[in-house]
Amino acid sequence: FINCTFLNCNLASAEFSETRFDQCRFSEPDLSAATIFRFSKLVQCTLQECDLSGCDLSSSLWFGSHFERCRARAVKATGFSSTKMINEHLPLSELTANQTDFSFSDFSGANLSYANFSDCNFENGILAAANLQCAALTDCNLLDIEWHDAVLRELDLRGAMFNTINPKTLDLKDVVISPLQVEMLSEHLGLIIQFD
């Protein structure tokens, strides 16, 4: 699909596989007429320079999909997942996003383990109870995020800007940060870092 417009579309429970969307619009600029993807499956799909702002992505599966330079502001993505089950005991996770704006979006309870986000904007978003284990949020804007009960073990945060990750309330075991980010984490501990 190239330069297509999907307004007021109900794609709930729809299935797409290896589908490409280039410069497509799924809502109006004021976030009205947003498309519904609730419970849909988009497996190994590519969205490039698309606008999904205001769309409902709740409980949808995006395994192996890729977002490139998309606008996805204020999306409702509670229960969003990048993980498909190969069998009863074997999950497989994959999702990538580059230079995509997810600001003001709600990813509560999302399963984003092993997802790779690079240079994305999540500012003022909600990642409460989201599973980000072994994921990467490199060079992302993570300012003013709600992290309550999020799983962050082994998360790669190198180059990201954040101000609400509290090491007293979140398990940061094996989280990867750069030396310049130590000060961002130490603020919640009352430490003053001085570089000589």
Describe the role of every protein-language-model region.
Residues F1-D196:
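Tandem repeat scaffolds
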